[in-house]
Amino acid sequence: MGDPKYPRRVWRKPKRPLNYELKMEELKTLGTFGLRTKRELWKAHTELSRVRHQARSLLALRQEVRAEKEPILMKSLARIGLVSSDATLDDVLNLTANDLLSRRLQTIVTKKLGFKTPYQARQAVIHGHIMIGERKVDIPSYTVTVEEENSIHFAPESKIPQVLEKTKSEAPAEETVEAPAEETVEAPAEEKKEESPSTES
């Protein structure tokens, strides 16, 4: 039967998870990309660490071995839109976790299909409203390739496009209301003072 497979953890926690600056940066990233938990962010950091480790390992190889293995890594990264076709290993080392998160299906759907927030796009993906080509994809963290990016669209039975158009048309236009003119009211004339004071007896 063979040895059983033990799944390896695909994410690692930061060394100082309670650091204030790190926590604020993580919360900002969670809001920007609509992540549900920090675990999704840690997965991106772990994957980035793996890719950068491969790049550093290639830099340490002999030139002939590096020339054989480097195109394999660069082609795989260019396929998912992380680097350009003429990028170098230095470009790989300059990648950030935000670069990986920007290739998620949730992020691309937010920008491409006109959602206001990434959380709206996440709900649409999870409930099967998004298709890539002829197949539905309900995984928000799915990594979209460059070839697939132009084939992302709503499912034919989805009513979300009509809802988005309706919300756009019902958005109240900003009207400039002129302030009412102030009415000038003349002050009443002062009562005439007594012509002569009372005479002393």
Swiss-Prot record:
Molecular function terms from GO: rRNA binding; structural constituent of ribosome
SUPFAM superfamilies: Alpha-L RNA-binding motif
Biased composition (Basic and acidic residues): 189-201
CDD domains for this protein: S4
Record's keyword terms, sorted: Ribonucleoprotein, Ribosomal protein, RNA-binding, rRNA-binding
PROSITE patterns per record: S4
Cellular component aspect of the GO annotation: small ribosomal subunit
InterPro entries linked to this entry: Ribosomal_uS4, Ribosomal_uS4_arc, Ribosomal_uS4_euk/arc, Ribosomal_uS4_N, S4_RNA-bd, S4_RNA-bd_sf
Listed Acidic residues bias regions: 172-185
One Pfam family of this chain: Ribosomal_S4
Subunit structure: Part of the 30S ribosomal subunit. Contacts protein S5. The interaction surface between S4 and S5 is involved in control of translational fidelity.
Functional description taken from the UniProt entry: One of the primary rRNA binding proteins, it binds directly to 16S rRNA where it nucleates assembly of the body of the 30S subunit.
Recorded family membership: Belongs to the universal ribosomal protein uS4 family.
Official protein name in the record: Small ribosomal subunit protein uS4
Gene it is expressed from: rps4
